[in-house]
Amino acid sequence: ALKIYHWPFLAQPEPLPETLIGGNPEFYLKHVMASWTAARSLDAFDPRALTHYLTAFRDPLRIHASCEDYRAGAYADYEHDKADREAGNRITTPMLALWGGAAIAAAAAPPLAAWQQWATDVTGVAIESGHFMAEENPEATAAALLKFLSE
């Protein structure tokens, strides 16, 4: 549960997470991003991209939007997903699931098994990375995407 603290934290009613994050958005974002990488550092990020992320996250409206995404996942999205499951709705297009082998998702329920409950034709592979596959291991991420798209 400690690894996924961000879900219940960010889903709290406003303005709690917005206020706490807004007190030092650069510290919060750097901490979260570093802790979600396999190396627990920001080394995988191009400095220009990191500057862009930090600039965007200093905007209170973007912080709020991030929190709203988690609130939706905890409440409205959950209800929609539940209704889809009860109706027997499934994703029928071929689907590729990628996840970081050292990421939080890998420590919870197996990601491929989770997606197989929702899709009829899903394949997947763990990328040797944390949460940020494209930044941490671009070669393996691109190879997995190209393989899937060429089939």
PLM feature spans:
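Catalytic histidine-centered segment of alpha/beta-hydrolase-like enzymes
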Residues: 130-142
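Flexible "cap/lid" subdomain of the alpha/beta-hydrolase fold that forms the substrate-access gate
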Residues: 1-126, 146, 151
